[in-house]
Amino acid sequence: MKKALLLCSTHNDLGLINALKKLEYYIIVTGNVSGLPGQKYCDEFIQADYSDKELILDIAKNNNIDVIVQCCNDFGVYTASYIAEKLGLPGYDDYETTLILHNKDKFKAFAKENEIISPVSTSFSDEVSAFEFCNRSAYPLIIKPTDCSAGNGIKRVDNDIEAKEAIQYAFEKSRAKRIVIEPFIDGKQHGFCSFLIDQKVVAVSTNDEYSFLNPYRVEIDTFPAIQTEKTKQILVEQIEKIASILKLKDGIFHLQYIEDENGPHIIEVMRRILGNMYSVPANRLNGFDWDYWETRARCGLSLEDFPKNHPSDGYFAYKTILASSNGVIESINILSKYNKYLVDSFLLKKPGDSVKRFESEPIGFLFLRFSSMEEMHKVLINEYENNMVNMRG
């Protein structure tokens, strides 16, 4: 039996685990902590920090792995690409390309050089230079760590006082101690997940992103996006341009973009599965298993039977269950108004568990199907509620 090294086993990695089992790999999984949701479905667990490239490289060598599968985290992407390059394993872009795509400062420099439609960004490695830049720039601005995901460390600023605090905060969150500062674009945020084969887009899943409790962490995704054919065409052209320049390998290429009256602006790209169990509604929308095909790509297996240009159908969404304060969970109650739309759910926490970062710590997810776009937005957006978790101090 061939061996696969999977870098983590969170709820977001369950689809990768299912795919590896379907492909009959012996699954060795790593992670900082034991007991994650997917660990029990794997064959072997080695407690190790998957962001430590040299440590994971030693594990890969000692276990004679045949393939490596990244997890739902950018640091996992770095490590998987690094090890694939060192050991000659299939399925990954070269390490330098991975760094370009998954570091905001490197990607923005690449975008500027190659005329990719992305906000102009300035990078900094010290607080003084960053603050001086803000002081002579027009507000509002947005300040981000270069190497964080899920909205970590990001803040909009409207004056010098806010800028100073946000710069300190972003540097605290960045492992690399680098940040970027950009003009704030006022528009609607969307996701555009594509699958590449031979550097061409052969499938897409589109969604609108909504953030209520935390403006920088997506809370609700609705599928498909409210999007014109022109916007879709522009984004496909941009992705294929990036893929051609960087000679990207097959597999998922996801981007987030903000659209205003001037069109779409690409704010972030990534080559991995998405958080918030994104593939659950995406699979239903597209009629195929995104995680399965992504796993085949990362394992270097044939994609000859990939369902190219498969039509999407239906209206789907996920809603993140969040607490409204820190403390201990008293009870979790799914609102009755969601029952008629509910197709699945996944809980990460239970009564008695603690919540320390309520604005960014998911309690679970609801997966829903609607009969129309209008119904979906009415129930989830226009009539938004966040009262399914009762807390005690």
Residue positions per predicted region:
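Short beta-strand-to-loop capping motifs
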Residues: 158-159, 194, 321-325, 366-372
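Gly/Ser/Thr-rich active-site loops/lids in small-molecule metabolic enzymes
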Residues: 282-294
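A structural supersecondary motif
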Residues: 253, 264, 338-351
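A glycine-rich beta-turn/hairpin centered on an aromatic-Pro dipeptide
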Residues: 299-340
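Phosphate-binding core of ATP-grasp and ATP-grasp-like enzymes
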Residues: 170-178, 183-225, 233-266, 270-278, ...
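ATP-binding N-terminal substructure of ATP-dependent carboxylate-amine bond-forming enzymes
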Residues: 1-96, 128, 301, 312-313, ...
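Short, well-ordered beta-strand elements within core beta-sheets of diverse protein domains
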Residues: 155, 183, 283, 364-371
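Active-site nucleotide/adenylate-binding loops and adjacent lid/helix of ATP-dependent enzymes
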Residues: 98-180, 186, 198, 222-237, ...
